[in-house]
Amino acid sequence: MNKDIIIGIDAGTSLIKAVAFTTNGRELGISSTPNEYTIKSDGKATQSLELTWKNCCKVIKDLGNQFNNFEKRVCLISVTGQGDGTWLIDKNGEPVCDAWLWLDSRSSDIAKKLTNLESEEMRFIATGTGMFSGQQSSQLLFMETHHRETLDKAKTAFHCKDWIYYKLTGIKATDPSESCFTFGNFRTQEY
């Protein structure tokens, strides 16, 4: 059996999609399902890690049902997902709390204070990005002050796509562009 199918997964905030391609890039099939998130008046915007994973499994299964011998034909899975946010797991790989999404604004005061520091220009030059409340840096600082018990339980901070990759492989990893986005130098890819 030839391994002739590439799967692309996009774990978006409101929709999760999976697309099957040939190894030459021709689209073969697609599946999608809505993804749920919660927004509160205090700026809270969260999403269940478990539900996001369950929805990813659903779209992969639905996609697989479109092909014969799907499992044996897949040669590659690529994962992308919503940017920024904070997806925390404990030492056993279990979610500590719902993910703080990129549109969560609870840490906006912290982001504003960080933006006004003298070191902001140096940080911007290194990271190539402006500071905002949806980034892990400001969210983790907010948690340190207001949700210490949650942060104390956490062993790993992921972004959405890293969570999906972890669930697919059991490996805790990210790509250099993601890890350097708010905490490192994107030019040198150093953390």
What function would you assign to each model-found segment?
Residues 29, 115-117, 172:
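Short, compositionally biased low-complexity segments
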Residues 11-13, 123-191:
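Gly/Ser/Thr-rich active-site cleft segment
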Residues 65-69, 116, 145, 149:
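Secondary-structure boundary motif
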Residues 110:
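Active-site metal-coordination/substrate-binding segment of hydrolases
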Residues 1-97, 153:
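N-terminal glycine/serine-rich phosphate-binding loop of ATP-dependent small-molecule kinases
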Residues 104:
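Carbohydrate-associated surface elements
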Residues 91-95, 113, 117-122:
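Hydrophobic or amphipathic alpha-helical targeting/insertion segments
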Residues 67-101, 127-134, 165-185:
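Short beta-strand-loop/turn "lid" adjacent to the catalytic site in phosphate-handling enzymes
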